[in-house]
A protein has these predicted regions:
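N-terminal cap/lid segment of alpha/beta-hydrolase-fold proteins
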Residues: 36-73
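Short amphipathic alpha-helix adjacent to the substrate-entry channel of hydrolases
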Residues: 94-111
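Mobile cap/lid helix-loop segments that gate and shape the active-site cleft of serine hydrolases
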Residues: 45, 61, 191-221, 227
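Short beta-strand element of the alpha/beta-hydrolase
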Residues: 76-85
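Short beta-strand/loop motif that positions the catalytic acidic residue
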Residues: 231-233, 237
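Alpha/beta-hydrolase active-site loop
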Residues: 122-141
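Primarily recognizes the serine-hydrolase "nucleophile elbow" in alpha/beta-hydrolase
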Residues: 138-200
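C-terminal catalytic histidine-bearing segment of alpha/beta-hydrolase fold enzymes
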Residues: 255-301
Length: 323
């Protein structure tokens, strides 16, 4: 098994319910703040130029719904399926409206699904929900002006973990007659890719036997056959520490895969989403980096230009490695 010394500051809680409540509150506050910032400093007419459909049922059995954000009159647009974080325990799709609006205002079709969470379900049940939402997206992307040949899975924190497993572990999409290579790419924002040993509830969420520990780690399934990966990570993140993204990129290089690693100085766990919402000077160029990747995902094993410095970030670019 591939192991890295993990991250997780605030994921550690003494009591399950206190931890879940704190996670939910933190997720809600982050989402609320970013939404206010986006509404204040974002494009004044961005939301008015969007076609938004909320509450679409994609899994009637489990009452799961998703929201779609698309530019008006979109045609052949790239599609991003975004999975929000919350320690696999908290979060709601409506809290991340600002993510949908921000990305859609840049020409992308965005799908934000809900998924079941602990303690209602344990791993891998929420992975089945994520794969099901992805299958729905393939079937319906064209209805919203999206291109089913250019569907990316993305996520922040625990959502980045979910997106990475969809892209790397073939079993989840296979249940819905898809493969990871049907995806155009994976975009992880401070994703948890290599987080053993577990802390607190993680053993209950994923299972503390050998199979559960192995299957929970996206890094174990990087074999060079996954789609290109964009790994965005703040160097000041003490919840999901940078060695998650660094180890994932190094593993991709070792397996002759493609991972573009972007490391941002003075950026913590929530700053990536705030930067995505605000996009102001002096913040890490999260939106620009996502748009560049979506516009032209790097070919497998192709050498990318070395990273450039920015006031808030230093970026190391090379498929699956550091420079």
């Amino acid at each position: 098994m591939i192991g890295t010394k993990p991250r997780v500051g605030n994921f550690r809680r003494h009591w399950r319910h206190a931890r879940a409540a704190a996670t939910a509150l933190a997720s809600l506050l982050l989402a609320a703040c970013a939404q206010v910032w986006y509404a204040t400093v974002g494009s004044a007419d961005s939301a008015h130029d969007l076609a938004i459909r909320r509450g679409i049922v994609f899994d009637a059995e489990h009452a799961l719904k998703l929201d779609v954000y698309a530019p008006h009159a979109a045609a052949g647009a790239p599609v991003v399926v975004f999975f929000y974080g919350g320690s696999w325990e908290a979060g709601r799709r409506r809290w991340y409206r600002y993510v949908g609006e921000a990305l859609a205002s840049q020409g992308l079709v965005v799908v934000i699904p809900d998924y079941r969470k602990f303690p209602d379900v344990r791993f891998p049940e929420f992975m089945s929900d994520a794969a099901n939402a992805t299958k729905w997206t393939f079937a319906h992307a064209a209805e919203f002006g999206g291109d089913a040949r250019r569907i990316f899975v993305a996520g922040h924190s625990a959502g980045g973990h979910i997106a990475a497993l969809l892209a790397c572990d073939k079993r989840y999409l296979a249940k819905f007659d898809l493969t990871p290579r049907d995806l155009a790419g994976m975009i992880g924002l401070a994703g948890a890719y290599a987080f053993l040993p577990y802390v607190e509830d993680e053993a209950e969420i994923f299972g503390d036997d050998a199979a559960g520990r192995y299957d929970s780690q996206p890094i174990n399934f990087v074999d060079g056959d996954e789609p290109p990966m964009l790994l965005l990570q703040g160097l000041a993140d003490d919840e999901v520490t940078p060695n998650n993204a660094e180890a994932m990129a190094e593993r991709a290089q070792a397996m002759d895969g493609t991972a573009v690693l972007k490391l941002y100085r003075d950026t913590d766990h929530g700053d990536l989403l705030v930067a995505l919402a605000r996009g102001r000077a002096g913040q890490p160029p999260v939106m620009r980096d996502i748009l560049d990747f979506v516009a032209k995902p790097p070919a497998r094993s192709s050498l990318l230009p070395s990273g450039e410095g920015t006031p808030q970030g230093r970026m190391r670019e090379k498929p699956g490695s550091l420079q």
